């Protein structure tokens, strides 16, 4: 059985954001604007996405 994955895209700049939010975005594997990272769909990853939901977009 394959693992479920979720793709996340950074859609807003990190300029002016809190340091812990920047660290969370880096933890999601995102570096630049419009960069996309494919991650396993786990509760930990979902929590990270929820924390920085104003910066990222979950794509199909």
Swiss-Prot record:
Similarity remark: Belongs to the universal ribosomal protein uL30 family.
Keywords, sorted A to Z: Ribonucleoprotein, Ribosomal protein
GO biological process, alphabetically ordered: translation
Keyword Repeat appears in the UniProt entry: no
SUPFAM superfamilies with a match to the protein in the record: Ribosomal protein L30p/L7e
Species the sequence originates in: Ralstonia pickettii (strain 12J)
Keyword Chloroplast tagged: no
Organismal lineage: Bacteria, Pseudomonadati, Pseudomonadota, Betaproteobacteria, Burkholderiales
GO cellular component terms attached to this protein's record: cytosolic large ribosomal subunit
Protein name: Large ribosomal subunit protein uL30
GO molecular function terms noted in the UniProt entry: structural constituent of ribosome
InterPro entries for the chain: Ribo_uL30_ferredoxin-like_sf, Ribosomal_uL30_bac-type, Ribosomal_uL30_ferredoxin-like
Assembly mode: Part of the 50S ribosomal subunit.
